[in-house]
Amino acid sequence: MTQLNIAPASTDTAAASNNNAAAGTKQLARWRVADIVSLYELPFNDLMFQAQQTHREHFDANTVQLSTLLSIKTGGCEEDCAYCPQSVHHDTGLQADKLMPVDEVLAAAKVAKENGATRFCMGAAWRNPKDRHLEPIKDMIRGVKAMGLETCVTLGMLETHQAQGLREAGLDYYNHNLDTSPEFYGQIISTRTYQDRLDTLERVRDAGINVCCGGIVGLGESRRERAGLIAQLANMDPYPESVPINNLVQVEGTPLTGTEAIDPFEFVRTIAIARITMPRAMVRLSAGREQMNEALQAMCFLAGANSIFYGDQLLTTSNPQAEADRKLLERLGIRAEAAQQMPLDQSGCEHGCDKHAAPN
């Protein structure tokens, strides 16, 4: 089984490069937490300039992908994630529902496509799905793909055979977020370990499914802990093809109600650093967009975000209305279509910046 390599925060990049050269192997430079903290500490304009340069090297800077996320099974989750209104551990007034019928999901996908989405994501609030749950979900995947939409599901932890079954159904992406850094993780979740998450990501990768993996900021973590999350993501080998960055949406009844909100510029910095450290990933502006004004959203696009979740609801929290999204993108001159990745420049640094030398 191919192991997802997570580099320790204290990795000495220069020494690692020398060892690799001596062994005749090629390996990308690894991001230390200290490197990422240094990016956070750059003057804001310098960071934005570097992020935009990186973005333009790898993508059309005036294109974003519209994604729609549908909750196909809401509430009743046995996990205790402190941010989540779907947990049975929190009294949020959310009513648990059973898995949606396949025809209703496909009808929602049809509407999403008519509204301009090119990616359809389906989320179910489970710790881990039973095998019997996956049969109708495979039908959903096949039906959505038949419409020409990119497919993504998030169902919790997976076993090896389950990941393989989803791949055989044609699944494009599996979402399983790390949520936060290893150091802060215990403050947020106790029912699932960090290694549990990494194990599921490994099974997804081994099955040949693209990885969608990001996190949430504004949970009460420090800047260094935010940097720790980015380091974990960027040092995956390979890093995720899709990186959703969520801004905490506080829901009454969850333990994080009343948490001090993250500074808006710090959120933009996080988007920019995700772009710099994972230059060829789709960086998705995800939950929390409703609490951002239009200028802040535009700044996130400038920082390198090239996908938004589009529609009136994002799982169990609200999202800017579709018409407002269309008008904003039009005013910014941004086209809503599948983002086009630029050809890889084999001679340059894969990280897309002058901070790292290209591997020898």
Curated annotation (Swiss-Prot):
SUPFAM superfamilies, alphabetized: Radical SAM enzymes (SSF102114)
Functional pathway: Cofactor biosynthesis; biotin biosynthesis; biotin from 7,8-diaminononanoate: step 2/2
Keyword annotations from UniProtKB, A to Z: 2Fe-2S, 4Fe-4S, Biotin biosynthesis, Iron, Iron-sulfur, Metal-binding, S-adenosyl-L-methionine, Transferase
Residues given in the record as [4Fe-4S] cluster binding sites: 77, 81, 84
Quaternary assembly: Homodimer.
Residue segments, region Disordered: 1-21
Catalytic activity from the UniProt record: (4R,5S)-dethiobiotin + (sulfur carrier)-SH + 2 reduced [2Fe-2S]-[ferredoxin] + 2 S-adenosyl-L-methionine = (sulfur carrier)-H + biotin + 2 5'-deoxyadenosine + 2 L-methionine + 2 oxidized [2Fe-2S]-[ferredoxin]
Gene3D superfamilies to which the protein is assigned, alphabetical: Aldolase class I
Function description: Catalyzes the conversion of dethiobiotin (DTB) to biotin by the insertion of a sulfur atom into dethiobiotin via a radical-based mechanism.
Cofactor note: Binds 1 [4Fe-4S] cluster. The cluster is coordinated with 3 cysteines and an exchangeable S-adenosyl-L-methionine.
Keyword hit for Transmembrane helix: no
EC numbers: 2.8.1.6
Protein name (Swiss-Prot/TrEMBL): Biotin synthase
